[in-house]
Swiss-Prot record:
Taxonomic classification: Bacteria, Pseudomonadati, Bacteroidota, Flavobacteriia, Flavobacteriales
PROSITE patterns: N6_MTASE
The keyword Cytoplasm belongs to this UniProt entry's keyword annotation: yes
Organism: Christiangramia forsetii (strain DSM 17595 / CGMCC 1.15422 / KT0803) (Gramella forsetii)
Recorded GO MF terms: nucleic acid binding; tRNA (adenine-N6)-methyltransferase activity
Entry protein name: tRNA1(Val) (adenine(37)-N6)-methyltransferase
Domain of life: Bacteria
Length: 240
């Protein structure tokens, strides 16, 4: 089933050649990301299927939405997904490692929004599937490298939006602080009201301000979603 096209309200995604399939984390980030500063240029780091870039193309009027993907199969598939969408003229995917991309682009015009659903399993466990491991494990793109690179590519009033494990939140805040990036909003995500917090959605920028912190609960019970979650993703999912 996971190799079938995933149909959203305004676009469809083929994912049969992508190691990491569409999941809740990516949809959450794409729907949650703040567009209140009306970004003209967006960069999606580690785009995979192209999901988040496509969601932001639907949500925003940004003239330029770049994506970056190191794994060849995922890169090729994201390009096809972009071309098959209504926003192909605004979407472009680079096939490169992040450090190479930063070195090449840091003297160019900066991005108003940089967004990433980064690989975050830092355990030594490997599945045996090289592409899935590369997509999933933090040693493929360490959080430190991601934040440092993003700080070089972000415009003065730009935002860096991430979804990370809640267990990594403190580490992320320490790293961003050392690069003069500060959290202006944090949403902590839990599966149900009684379950522990699993994820942190964080928006950073270069302006220090009081951090708005809230929580998002996804389900009341199995496949019975909360109104707040449905409201967040209602423009994307065909049904909930």
């Amino acid at each position: 089933m996971s190799n079938q096209p995933f149909k959203f309200k305004q676009f469809s995604i083929d994912q049969d050649r992508c190691a990491m399939k569409i999941g809740t984390d990516g949809v959450l980030l794409g729907a949650w990301a703040s567009l209140e500063h009306f970004p003209d240029s967006i960069l999606d780091i580690g785009t995979g299927t192209g999901l988040i870039a496509l969601m932001l193309a639907q949500r925003s009027d940004a003239e330029l939405i770049d994506a970056l993907e190191i794994e060849e199969n995922a890169y090729e598939q994201s390009v096809e997904n972009f071309e098959n969408s209504d926003w192909g003229d605004r979407l472009f995917c680079y096939h490169a490692a992040f450090d190479e991309f930063v070195e090449e682009m840091q003297d160019e015009e900066k991005y108003d929004l940089i967004i990433s659903n980064p690989p975050f399993y830092s355990e030594n466990y490997k599945t045996g599937d090289e592409y899935r491991d590369q997509a999933r494990f933090a040693d493929a793109l360490p959080l430190t490298e991601l934040i440092q690179g993003a700080s070089h590519l972000l415009s003065e009033n730009g935002h860096l939006d991430l979804i990370i494990p809640f267990s990594e939140e403190r580490k992320a805040l320490e790293i961003t602080s050392s690069h003069n990036l500060f959290p202006n909003k944090i949403t902590r995500v839990k599966g149900t009201a009684n379950s522990p917090i699993k994820r942190s959605l964080i928006s950073f920028n270069f302006q220090k301000s009081e951090t708005v912190i809230d929580e998002l609960t996804l389900e009341i019970s199995r496949h019975h979603y909360t109104e707040e979650f449905k409201e967040l993703v209602q423009d994307f999912y065909l049904k909930l």
